[in-house]
Amino acid sequence: MAAAELADTQLMLGVGLIEKDTNGEVLWVWCYPSTTATLRNLLLRKCCLTDENKLLHPFVFGQYRRTWFYITIIEVPDSSILKKVTHFSIVLTAKDFNPEKYAAFTRILCRMYLKHGSPVKMMESYIAVLTKGICQSEENGSFLSKDFDARKAYPAGSIKDIVSQFGMETVILHTALMLKKRIVVYHPKIEAVQEFTRTLPALVWHRQDWTILHSYVHLNADELEALQMCTGYVAGFVDLEVSNRPDLYDVFVNLAESEITIAPLAKEAMAMGKLHKEMGQLIVQSAEDPEKSESQVIQDIALKTREIFTNLAPFSEVSADGEKRVLNLEALKQKRFPPATENFLYHLAAAEQMLKI
């Protein structure tokens, strides 16, 4: 097996099964290998089967303490051999961000469970993918890990959609991401939250960092503690109560109302000037061009972002220990940039860990 394939098969961490029975009880039925009580409780919360009178969400995903979770939820048809089960969820945990890959695999596992009513076939398929990167089944479909390149998962969202909703205000999101600030996104529909939040890291394409994404967070003490351990993040919520938690965000996005709010404590670092106006104009111009694809928009923003780092380069020097480049603040001040530009470059250097300690 090729090294790349081997690495890919080692990304999955576990598989689990949650059922809702005819009495309305939701039970963690089975998993392979074992899991912790904390993670089990989290996944029970995420699967939405415990929510009374709420719509089913066919597929949800998120991250908790560097473990990604992917959950497909199925309503059991009357014809199924699962006579005492009304709904069930298949849960996959993994080390990588790749919603399309794990949605495809969980759908196959769901079809297997509907047909056989036993986790045995699911476990066989899980182990086949874990060890060989493939599972084949005539009646349930085939799955091949290498068909789902992680690099395709990154640009899968739509920056054009974000710009059509927020226009020039998109630059606030770009600035917050550049400065590694905390962005909280609210919408009552989890599908809207996930689609929007997964796209945001593409605004800082040079980092290729989707570990900042926490697309489905509950106002739960353990989840919030895990979130607050991160320096900067993009976190999605479906509970409007999060708007009353300014300790959780520097920028709050109310998707339902198309509003972006900068928290008072973040306003100084997020002060906008000529540099931001130019960036905003470029983002809008590129995104509104019908001839340009999503990937071209990402590349346009990435090129302009590189220019910003080029602006910063003349004011950096090798640190005393020779290990990294640090900001020469005096040189930056002598350049006499407009205050907002100087302020932004200083905070960008801080985000890139270029300040002298």
UniProtKB/Swiss-Prot annotation:
Domain uDENN: 1-140
A GO CC term attached to the entry: late endosome
Principal place of residence: other
Ranges of residues in domain dDENN: 301-357
Domain spans labelled cDENN: 159-299
InterPro entries in alphabetical order: FAM45 (IPR042431), Tripartite_DENN (IPR037516)
Record's keyword terms, sorted: Endosome, Guanine-nucleotide releasing factor
Compartment(s) where it occurs, according to its Swiss-Prot or TrEMBL record: Late endosome
Domain of life: Eukaryota
A GO biological-process term: protein transport
GO molecular function term, any single one: guanyl-nucleotide exchange factor activity
The family this protein is said to belong to: Belongs to the DENND10 family.
PANTHER family in UniProt: DENN DOMAIN-CONTAINING PROTEIN 10-RELATED (PTHR28544:SF1), PROTEIN FAM45A-RELATED (PTHR28544)
Protein purpose: May be a guanine nucleotide exchange factor (GEF).
Stated name of the protein: Putative DENN domain-containing protein 10 B
Native organism: Homo sapiens
